[in-house]
Design a protein with these regions (language model features):
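Activation segment signature within eukaryotic-like protein kinase domains
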Residues: 141-142
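Protein kinase catalytic-loop region centered on the HRD/HxD motif
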Residues: 147-157
């Protein structure tokens, strides 16, 4: 079960009758503060995501509900770092390219976060489907994601889980960074062992060796995302064994993007490889500098 957290946005609403019995985890129509979960969209070990609505205005939203295990992870991070959990951190981030957090709290013994609803899907899925939503505007989508990350860093936050799965599109096609569940402030970059987070294929080498998080590790993960966007495949083969996957990052050279897809321009390849330099001091010193170079390329460079 979740620990205590201050509730936000609790309205005078009642729990309703069963709705999600076929989905397993929740056996009643779940009310979270002033919002109601309507349709299960996705789920994993840490959380379940629902399409929801405001009980009075019917505004469509996304409701993220942490599982018991997700609550344990959130409590562990809060206790180890002495910092607010995801809802409180994310609610302070206000930028056109960062998902808006509308409310957060605890209900039914679980933490929840209410966010703006992004119906456009995530970038990873859109790329796999060759969706018209991103075809012809892949670079612009990543530029927008970079603007969001630039802002996040300016607010003293390190995302720690940058990947195409965590870039989603709004109805008008605007790209937004999502999922600040493992984000951390710059003041807490010296972490105790055992708190390494993120997807192995997107982890910078120094993170695997030394558990060091900073803006540069986000830049590396952004570079991996650019590589995937440009070539249609990850820079390294993946492994279901997490230790083997981490070893690949340290020991397997990155094939130059143009060796995978010769149509990629040399200038775009240069941007990708600089963002993914094994040594952090050889990477872009900031997302701002990376964004400056991205302004000089288009989808014609793919």
């Amino acid at each position: 079960m979740c620990g205590n957290q201050r509730e936000r946005g609790e309205g005078n609403v009642a729990r309703l009758n069963s709705l999600f019995g076929s989905h397993g985890e929740y056996t009643d129509t779940s009310i979270y503060g002033e919002y109601r979960a309507v349709e299960r969209l996705a789920g994993g070990r840490l959380s379940t995501l629902y399409r929801g609505e405001h009980v009075q205005t019917r505004e469509v939203v996304a409701v993220k509900v942490l599982s018991d295990y997700g609550c344990q992870v959130a409590n562990k991070l809060t206790q180890r770092l002495g910092k607010p959990w995801e809802g409180e951190r994310a609610s302070k981030l206000q930028h056109p390219n960062v998902v808006r957090t509308l409310a957060y709290g605890k209900a039914h013994d679980r933490y929840y976060i209410v966010m703006e609803y992004l119906p456009g899907g995530n970038l990873a899925g859109l790329l796999q489907m060759h969706s018209p939503a991103v075809e012809g505007r892949k670079i612009e989508t990543m530029r927008q994601a970079a603007r969001g990350l630039e802002y996040v860093h300016s607010r003293g936050v390190i995302h720690r889980d940058i990947s195409p799965r965590n870039v989603m599109l709004a109805a008008d096609g605007t790209a937004k960074l999502i999922d600040f569940g493992v984000s951390i402030s710059k003041a807490d970059v010296v972490l105790k062992r055992g708190l390494r987070t993120g997807r192995p294929g997107y982890m910078a080498p120094e993170l695997i060796r030394d558990y060091k998080y900073n803006e540069s590790t986000d830049i590396y993960a952004f570079g991996v995302s650019l590589y995937y966007l440009a070539t249609g495949q990850p820079p390294r083969q993946t492994s279901e064994d997490p230790f083997e996957a981490l070893a690949m990052v340290l020991n397997t050279p990155i094939p130059p993007p143009r060796s995978v897809r010769p149509t990629i321009s040399p200038r775009l390849e240069k941007i990708i490889l600089r963002a993914m330099e094994p040594h952090p001091f050889a990477r872009y010193p900031s997302v701002t500098r990376l964004l400056d170079d991205l302004l000089g390329v288009t989808d014609a460079d793919l």
